[in-house]
């Protein structure tokens, strides 16, 4: 079992309905259940990947997964924005039938602070997944899987009791909307959750760019896998990158190109 894994890499969302199918099959689970690793890249367009024809951006590791797996040519997100798409992914419902249909809402939900990339704050209203909402994590947990979410949940609104550990995940390592201290800055975070405990990242104090969120998330994911070698597990690894163009940590691959990285960032920001 520990040598078998299903790995999915996706830029947006799971096809709605798969969580519901998993619920029907959970009672038939056998000892030969595969491990499941689901990797989500935030705001990554399929045209940005080399394996889908991009001539600009180099994605060698994703290309390796594509070469040994299956590429989908007609796979659609539940929504074009973050929270509704993640809600469709977690519940298996299309956006028209799911609880979360926008990043913000005008009625219901809870209000809280939102921090912009520039560090400004504003008050917004968000809704969250409720205890009665079945997620793929609750289904797999009931089937005997160890479940873990690493990094971005984005389905908690401003309710601390709607974090991943209250929605089917045994472990959570990442940041929450409901806690301002953990959701900014995104890429060199000062704080981060370990289940329901807020951990301070001393290395990034005073705007020091020492521990990148992608590296922290990768380490958390690897450690979860190591701890669960003998268990069937479901790992949902939801990276922030490449959500914003300014998070690029190393651009030396592109030093010899005729275009500049600023050109790419400008096109991304204005698209």
Specify the residue positions occupied by each region the protein language model found.
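Formylglycine-dependent sulfatase
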Residues: 2-4, 13, 20-271
